[in-house]
Curated annotation (Swiss-Prot):
InterPro entries: NqrDE/RnfAE, RnfE. Part of a membrane-bound complex that couples electron transfer with translocation of ions across the membrane. Required to maintain the reduced state of SoxR. Its EC number is 7.-.-.-. It is a multi-pass membrane protein. One of its GO terms (biological process) is electron transport chain. It holds the Pfam family Rnf-Nqr. NCBIfam families: PRK12405.1 (NF009070), rnfE (TIGR01948). It is found in: Cell inner membrane. Belongs to the NqrDE/RnfAE family. This is Ion-translocating oxidoreductase complex subunit E.
Length: 231
């Protein structure tokens, strides 16, 4: 149980692929102009990570070490092609918005990295959980960045959600403030870099605060009864 918890915590926070490892920055910065696009690519990446980790882990005993990387890439490419066709069939608007970044999941360092570092060494169930956790960690980072850029740039949230979730999702669109002209800095790549930098700084501050609290808690437990630690 502790191993399962550790895999989840590592994927979502401690070893977050976007905010700690800084992998997959090309799609992270290019696609996150809206919350819908960010969520769509994030979920697609999560599905690919889960399925590829599961497949590679299942076949790990029959995969020759000398040619394992080409085999991993072939498996990843097959899964990405299937996911791309699913998005094309059931969410064509999102497919058009994401464009080339769906097939580029094949070359995403996150996917290949987890296949080599985790799935090739662990069992199928734990590998699938690792892929899901890493994918959801990246999805959360994409969604937060996409939401911030959309709100600051257009004053809306979930604009175009129907492209991802269907026509019923039009009701999810929220107009936070009205603007006649979008704030282009937030919508263009410089805004993505600035937003990512702020998110990295925020995560660092949260980690430092949590570390300080843990240190104080350990120090309090180490003191004899009745002492407060004050000089």
């Amino acid at each position: 149980m502790s191993e399962i918890k550790d895999v989840i915590v590592q994927g979502l926070w401690k070893n977050n692929s976007a905010l700690v490892q800084l992998l997959g920055l090309c799609p992270l910065l290019a696609v996150t102009s809206t919350a819908t696009n960010a969520l769509g690519l994030g979920l697609a990446t999560t599905l690919v990570l889960t399925l590829t980790n599961l497949t590679i882990s299942t076949l790990r005993h029959w995969t020759p070490a000398e040619i394992r990387i080409p085999i991993y890439v072939m498996i990843i490419a097959s899964v990405v092609s299937a996911v791309q066709m699913l998005i094309n069939a059931y969410a064509f608007g999102l497919y058009q918005s994401l464009g080339i970044f769906i097939p580029l999941i094949v070359t995403n360092c996150i996917v290949v990295g987890r296949a080599e570092a985790f799935a090739a060494k662990k069992g199928p169930a734990l590998s699938a959980l690792d892929g899901f956790s890493i994918g959801m960690g990246a999805t959360c980072a994409m969604f937060v960045l996409g939401s911030l850029r959309e709100i600051i740039g257009n004053g809306t949230l979930f604009d175009g959600a129907d492209a991802l979730l269907g026509s019923w999702a039009k009701v999810l669109r929220v107009e936070i403030f009205r603007t006649d002209s979008p704030f282009l800095l937030a919508m263009l790549p410089p805004g993505a870099f600035i937003g990512l930098g702020l998110m990295l700084a925020g995560k660092y501050l949260i980690d430092e605060k949590m570390k300080k609290r843990r240190t104080e808690a350990v120090a309090e437990r180490a003191l004899p009864n009745g002492e407060t630690g004050n000089v």
